[in-house]
C-alpha cells in the first residue's frame, strides 16, 4: 500500500474509533457489517457490535460513518 494511502487511512479510522462513531463496512463481496471500530492496524480492523469481528482490510470496499467526522491529515499528504 502506498504511503499516502496510509496517511489517509490512519487519521480517518482513528477519528472514528476515538469518537465512537457507528460505521457500516461494505466488503468486496457485498456483505454489509455494522458496528464501532475498536482498533486497527496495517492489515485488519476490529469491528465491535454484539461481538468483536476481525475484518481484513483487503476485504473492505467501503467504510461509511453514521455521521460526518473531522480528521486532520498532514499538509504533506495533500499533494
UniProtKB/Swiss-Prot annotation:
Protein family: Belongs to the Hfq family.
Pfam families linked to this entry: Hfq (PF17209)
Sm domain sequence ranges: 10-69
UniProtKB keywords: RNA-binding, Stress response
Species annotation: Cupriavidus necator (strain ATCC 17699 / DSM 428 / KCTC 22496 / NCIMB 10442 / H16 / Stanier 337) (Ralstonia eutropha)
Protein's job: RNA chaperone that binds small regulatory RNA (sRNAs) and mRNAs to facilitate mRNA translational regulation in response to envelope stress, environmental stress and changes in metabolite concentrations. Also binds with high specificity to tRNAs.
Assembly, per entry: Homohexamer.
UniProt-recorded name of the protein: RNA-binding protein Hfq
GO BP annotations, alphabetical order: regulation of DNA-templated transcription; regulation of RNA stability; regulation of translation, ncRNA-mediated
GO molecular function: RNA binding
Cellular component terms (Gene Ontology): cytosol
Amino acid at each position: 500500500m502506498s504511503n499516502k494511502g496510509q496517511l489517509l487511512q490512519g487519521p480517518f479510522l482513528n477519528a472514528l474509533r476515538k469518537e465512537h462513531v457507528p460505521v457500516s463496512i461494505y466488503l468486496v463481496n457485498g456483505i454489509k457489517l455494522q458496528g464501532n471500530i475498536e482498533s486497527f492496524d496495517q492489515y485488519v480492523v476490529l469491528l465491535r457490535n454484539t461481538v468483536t469481528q476481525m475484518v481484513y482490510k483487503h476485504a473492505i470496499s467501503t467504510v461509511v460513518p453514521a455521521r460526518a467526522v473531522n480528521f486532520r491529515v498532514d499538509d504533506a499528504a495533500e499533494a
